[in-house]
Amino acid sequence: YEIKECDWSSDVCSSDLAGIELVVYDLQDVGVRYYTYISTLSYMIEACAELRIPVLILDRPNPNGFYIDGPVLESDCNSFLGRFPIPVVYGMTCGELAQMMIGEHWLSVRETPSLTVIPLKGYNRNKTCQLETAPSPNLKDLKSVLFYPSLGWMEGTCLSLGRGTPGPFKQFGHPEYAGVTHSFIPVPNAINTHPRYAFKTCYGISLDTLQWLKHHPRKIELSWILQAYKSIPSQVPFFESSFDAHSGTKQLQLLIKNGASEAQIRSVWKKNLDLFKKRRQRYLLYPDFKNS
């Protein structure tokens, strides 16, 4: 089966699994809540548990596994972009997170899932890891993967994130973005057949010169969305209906609209973030990163 295309929550998929002895999960994730491989993984484990099929995870490095940041998902923002109370950047491998899903009883199962994780050898989450394969066509390299936690939730806004250009997730902009000179024109291609603002000139910010491979700030760069909100004309609706699902909270949109500073925003999600950091410790398979 193509795991990303199968509807693991459907009765049809459950019937298709009949007779299968083992399901193996081997995907390169990026360690961001709204990157939906982990939601697919959770549905897969649930479907397999229903039929008592064991699951084997071949663990892979988390390229954003060296920090934890962002709001913890609130229950009223639950969607395929986030099913469980974890922050945007959760600092765990897929194997570790799967163990947490089971251990915290987050999954909708009647039978305890049979899960085995084949761990990595010598994994050091303090170091930025090189990826053997691109996680997806629009996350082409490690640089875009590192930018993704700070950019991905902007897909719930009026901004283009460069889909349909040579540099998706390395820039962001809008046809009416004010006060900048960088520009790009999204064009349909085999990967992005209907990119936002196709054939229109978008003005905005290029991130390609940032040296995050060497000097990562170890946090979500909130200044990007705060700057973008101030740079789009007020008559243009900035937030779209999916933003709360991306951010995992209804508070962030309101805070930005009310002009909250980065420090004020971080203070709102700090308590739940600290609780998650403690909660995740019991599920770690590898030494934690420093200053966790």
Question: Where do the language-model regions lie?
Answer:
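Glycine/threonine-rich flexible loop motifs
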Residues: 29-41
